[in-house]
Amino acid sequence: MRYGFVRKKHRGLFLTTVAALPIWNPISEFVKWYKSHKLSQHCIRICGHLCQKHLDMFLSVIGQRWPIDVFSSVFDHQVSAIGSDIIWWFLKLFLVSFFFFF
């Protein structure tokens, strides 16, 4: 039986490898960046069309469940890096969920 393009005997190894990737690090960096630099309305629209209240609730839950890493870089130099990390994190999340459900 096949799960996407990964055979059943290789599925555990594939999922273990994906799970070992540091997928929460970009989220913790984003939480730290958000808390130090309040997002503008334009950035809130980019981040999934969430209103300010829901975004605050979402980030507070993530901040309570996962430790926030030290994020010492300056905002202007890290905008593109944070955006690419968030996109990469969602891509990895999609891949894991794809292999669990299909």
Swiss-Prot record:
- Keywords annotated in UniProt: Endoplasmic reticulum, Membrane, Transmembrane, Transmembrane helix
Instruction: Provide the protein's localization.
Output: Endoplasmic reticulum membrane
| Superkingdom of the organism of origin | Eukaryota
The record's Gene Ontology cellular component field reads: endoplasmic reticulum membrane
Major localisation: endoplasmic reticulum
Membrane disposition: Multi-pass membrane protein
- Keyword Hydrolase in the entry? The reply is no
Q: Where are the transmembrane segments?
A: 13-33, 82-102
Q: Which tissue types show expression of this protein?
A: Expressed in placenta with lower expression in brain, kidney and testis.
Disulfide bond annotation, renumbered to this chain: none
UniProt protein name: Protein PAPPAS
Q: Which organism is it from?
A: Homo sapiens (Human)
| Gene name as annotated | PAPPA-AS1
